[in-house]
Design a protein with these regions (language model features):
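Short, low-structural-confidence N-terminal segments
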Residues: 1-62, 68-69, 151, 155, ...
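N-terminal targeting/tethering segments
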Residues: 22-132, 208, 220
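Extracellular/periplasmic catalytic domains that process cell-envelope and extracellular macromolecules
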Residues: 29, 126, 180-184, 211-212, ...
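Core regions of peptidyl-prolyl cis-trans isomerase
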Residues: 41, 76, 129-156, 234, ...
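Acidic/polar surface patches and capping/hinge elements
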Residues: 103-126, 140-164
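C-terminal cap of thioredoxin/glutaredoxin-like
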Residues: 135, 139, 143, 159, ...
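Thiolate-centered catalytic microenvironments shared by cysteine-dependent enzyme domains
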Residues: 162-167, 217
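Structural alpha/beta surface segment adjacent to cysteine/selenocysteine redox centers
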Residues: 189-271, 276
Length: 348
């Protein structure tokens, strides 16, 4: 069964354009048709895409989100209507009948009611609240039973939403990559911040993904140091300084593992990796790699990415600290779309 997809969200960008878009899945067959006329000048979607590529992508992505939500909700409605017809009742009667059959008939114990009462911290006396508490508990149980019933119906059905998302072709120029394989069918691009706790939390899932999908996935990391994290900028610079000595990823992994980002610790980490510490210290103190970090940050800002981690997986946008199960599902779908087999190590 296909569960509700992770719905990408991409915001309107500035005119600083660093991405090329390949979103013909939701675009008209041609961008050359006239869609706007201003004072006799005829303009096409191609004109809009040239002026505001991220804005057009945002519009198509917003449509994709709305479309997939509507289709997913329609699938649930359809299943309920079909089941109701089989039982010769309305959908409302179907849900009510099922809930009544599983929700306990008796009242909760007096102790349970008083525990609930204490939890709401009401100024009203218990006796005045008792009837309301009972009704709230009953309604909560009914809602839970109905929700579980719907989930059961969905789990027994095959639901496949065919709407295809718009995709962005993210440039990997001057971007650290690993897990590189010839013609790897999946590319995961992460915008992240070394001081972001969610970026630190998602790293084990990415590591596991790299191990189990070896040769199938290429990983890229782009810097997006957030203003509220005082150590993030220099930590990113330090990783690039290590990269200048051929140990970007080793240093990258150490930063996310130790979570200690003071300047003194950054330099100590360089020594632990047996880098040329004199050259590293000079690189870090002089801000030699500051522009490299700022360039990737500017790219993220042009997309108006507002949080980390943010991912582009084969061009589709996902936001937040995805779990391994979520990442695996996305990658498996990408492999399926590319006709590449899922590795045995990743099968469950």
């Amino acid at each position: 069964m296909m569960t509700k997809p992770f719905l990408p969200l991409l915001l309107f960008s500035s005119s600083f354009c660093l991405l090329a878009f390949d979103d013909t899945s939701t675009a008209p067959s041609s961008n050359n048709g006239v869609v706007l006329e201003v004072d006799g000048t005829k303009l096409t979607l191609a004109d809009l895409e040239q002026k505001h590529p991220f804005g057009l992508f945002q519009a198509r992505n917003a449509f994709y989100q709305a479309e997939t939500r509507a289709l997913d909700e329609f699938a649930t409605e359809y299943l309920l209507e079909q089941q109701a017809q089989k039982e010769h009742v309305t959908v409302e009667e179907l849900l009510e009948r099922h809930a009544n059959s599983v929700v306990p008939k008796g009242e909760p114990s007096e102790e349970a009611l008083r525990l609930y009462y204490e939890g709401i911290e009401s100024k009203e006396p218990f006796e005045a609240m008792r009837a309301g508490i009972l009704e709230h508990i009953r309604q909560s149980r009914m809602l839970k039973a109905k929700t579980e019933y719907v989930q059961t119906l969905r789990s027994k059905a095959h639901i496949a939403v065919s709407a295809a998302p718009p995709r962005a072709a993210v440039s990997l120029k001057d971007t650290p990559v690993r897990g590189v394989a010839a013609n790897a069918p999946v590319t995961v691009v992460e915008y992240a911040d070394y001081e972001c706790p969610y970026c630190q939390q998602v790293q084990p899932a990415l590591d596991k993904l790299e191990t189990e999908y070896k040769g199938k996935v290429t990983f890229a990391y782009k810097d997006l140091p957030l203003p509220m994290h005082p150590h993030a900028q220099k930590a990113a610079e330090a990783a690039h300084c290590a990269g200048a000595q051929g140990k970007y990823w080793e240093y990258h992994d150490m930063l996310l593992a130790t979570k200690k980002l003071e300047i003194s610790q950054l330099k100590e980490d360089a020594g632990a990796l047996k880098l040329d510490t004199k050259a590293f210290d000079k690189c870090l103190d002089s801000g030699e790699q500051a522009e490299a970090v700022k360039a990737q940050n500017a790219e993220a800002q042009s997309l108006q990415l507002q949080g980390t981690p943010s991912f582009f997986i084969n061009g589709q946008f996902f936001s937040g600290g995805l779990t391994y199960e979520q990442l695996r599902g996305i990658v498996d779908e990408a492999l399926k779309a590319s006709s590449a087999p899922v590795p045995e190590a990743a099968k469950r």
